[in-house]
Amino acid sequence: MLFGGRQLSPEEEKQEQEQKKFDLLKYDGVKAMKIGQADYALRCFTEALKMKDDLEIHDYLSQVLLRQGELDAAMNELRTLGDAEPENAQIQIRIAQVAYMQEDYVAMEAACQQATTLEPENAEPYFLHAQALKGQQNPVGAIAMLTKAVTLKEDLAEAYLLRAQTLLAMGDTASAETDADWLLENVGDHEDVLLLKARVVAAKGQPQEAIAIYDKVIEVNPFQIDAFRERGRLRLDLGDKAGAEQDMQTVMELDPQQLADVSGEYSAEGIEQRVKQAYSTINPLGL
């Protein structure tokens, strides 16, 4: 060493070189991740972890794997983080989010319960817990969690939306409409909000009013298949066969496979019969 510094032993030299290599792999991996070079980032992070365990790299690795659609591998990395930091609620929230993508609602619920234990005043895990319960066909429990979520965070629009959708599916149109109206007032003419309102109004037996709202949905998003399909059903019920045919034709143009098992190829039976058959097979509310 220069300037009178101590000469490193061969073992220390080796450790220093390994640390430099580790740091370089980690740095290159982060850089690659930020510019979208996922494959190279994965290689860097994997090689770095072979040299030394590092929680920050496990975190980065989970993010890259998630972007790649490698849900199981991403979950493994998050589990490693969760085991290392059992008091970190944010890790449990991320585990719940990935479990939702995997449709593993039992694991999702467990992560949410741990997160709410750690952060009882955080609305997010209650919302996620509601999604888990809904996935387990427990709408009553889901509504309870959503109510808790909006109690903690009064402007949590996604909780109002999911609660309204769940209430509507249960047949409680009055309560669903209350949430829908809150959303219209506080969120405005958002596609999902308008679609919800149209479904509520249709469920109340007001087809003309519902059609007018479906018109607004289509103005916001001209490719909203559900809006065309559901509006067409209402038009058919009102005797507007031409309008129903037009909407069903649009649905088939936007997504030909959606009705392939119902309508098939055009045949001599006539468009009216095909439209009736298609609409009778599809749940008009999409619930």
List each model region and its residues:
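TPR-adjacent "capping" and linker segments in tetratricopeptide-repeat scaffold/adaptor proteins
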Residues: 2-24
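Terminal, low-structured helical/coil segments at or just beyond the last alpha-helical repeat
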Residues: 2-10, 245-246, 253-287
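Alpha-helical segment of the N-proximal tetratricopeptide repeat
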Residues: 18-56, 60-67, 90, 94-103, ...
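Helix-start (N-cap) detector for alpha-helical repeat units in TPR-like alpha-solenoids
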Residues: 22, 55-56, 89-90, 123-124, ...
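Structural signature of tandem alpha-helical TPR/SEL1-like repeats
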Residues: 36-40, 68-80, 102-114, 136-148, ...
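Short coil turns that delineate tetratricopeptide repeat
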Residues: 52-53, 86, 120, 154, ...
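Canonical tetratricopeptide repeat
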Residues: 60-61, 94, 128, 162, ...
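TPR/TPR-like (Sel1-like) alpha-helical repeat modules
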Residues: 185, 229, 233-260
